[in-house]
């Protein structure tokens, strides 16, 4: 499916139906995600660990966090969750999800600022309550004002924990692009590498785009976390499988206790 973020007009959510009458149906209004703010970016993730994808919308002005209630309705809970950031002139340019502290709940990094509006970037820690806490300083990230264009999470040093890369939009007038290494112990994380067999082997696409990964408690058989390989945010690592070297999508779960089982469902 495809979510399109617009400026000064309704956003659109296109459901991929793969039908004879046309592959996509616009359902943004029907599911209450046709936000009309000045949109900057959207970021999908299952922040509440209920097995479906929610979406954070970065805006000029008030941000939105749409909780997915079973695929039939989205509810904007940004204010209650503490991530609305609706102050005068506030500009959020991008957002990225990762469980940086390995507690089993996804955290949210917001890249902020613009041409004439320098602002601090923010890291919000998720928890069981669903209310995010500002952990920018406690995580060791700078709280100075800047203007960031984007941010992304990936394990660049291969130590098992997600690291953060933030891009600066003002060249010599700003701090430059920044790479923050996550020093938390790898035993708090579980890494899953996912790769499709490809169309020549009648399998899923090699990049595993669309694959659904569930982390399951081995004792209770309950799903405790869910992630999906998405095209814009998929992290890729080179691996060898069955004598063939190629790219695989990397999914990192915060896994503070175990044991766990992992279920992977490929598209198609």
Spell out what each predicted region is.
Residues 9, 38-40, 61, 91, ...:
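Beta-rich catalytic cores
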